[in-house]
């Protein structure tokens, strides 16, 4: 690798909106990153995931032409 062209790779604190914080490494200049979701509050990881059927294109097709079994 060429010397002097790569940004510094330093420890960075990631702060989630739920209040969870953890340390990782990044090239961020500020030393902190703000995240909207993390593994502590994301529905997929917490098991609180809801499956919503909004009646999309597939449901509309099935209503129109009948669902074939």
Swiss-Prot record:
PROSITE patterns, A to Z: RIBOSOMAL_L31
Signal peptide boundaries: none
Molecular function GO labels: metal ion binding; rRNA binding; structural constituent of ribosome
Membrane recorded as keyword: no
Keyword Repeat in annotation: no
SUPFAM superfamilies: L28p-like
Entry GO terms, CC: ribonucleoprotein complex; ribosome
Keyword vocabulary terms for this entry: Metal-binding, Ribonucleoprotein, Ribosomal protein, RNA-binding, rRNA-binding, Zinc
Needed cofactors: Zn(2+)
GO biological process entries: translation
Superkingdom as given in the UniProt entry: Bacteria
Residues involved in Zn(2+) binding: 16, 18, 38, 41
Note accompanying the cofactor annotation: Binds 1 zinc ion per subunit.
UniProt cross-references to PANTHER family, sorted A to Z: 50S RIBOSOMAL PROTEIN L31, CHLOROPLASTIC (PTHR33280), LARGE RIBOSOMAL SUBUNIT PROTEIN BL31C (PTHR33280:SF1)
Subunit structure, interactors included: Part of the 50S ribosomal subunit.
Described function: Binds the 23S rRNA.
Family: Belongs to the bacterial ribosomal protein bL31 family. Type A subfamily.
UniProt name for this protein: Large ribosomal subunit protein bL31
């Amino acid at each position: 690798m060429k010397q002097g062209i790569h940004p510094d790779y330093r420890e960075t604190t990631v702060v989630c909106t739920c209040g969870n914080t953890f340390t990782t490494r990044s090239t961020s200049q500020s030393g902190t990153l703000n995240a909207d979701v993390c593994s502590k509050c994301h529905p997929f990881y917490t098991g609180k995931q809801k499956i919503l059927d909004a009646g999309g294109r597939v449901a509309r097709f099935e209503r129109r032409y009948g669902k074939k079994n």
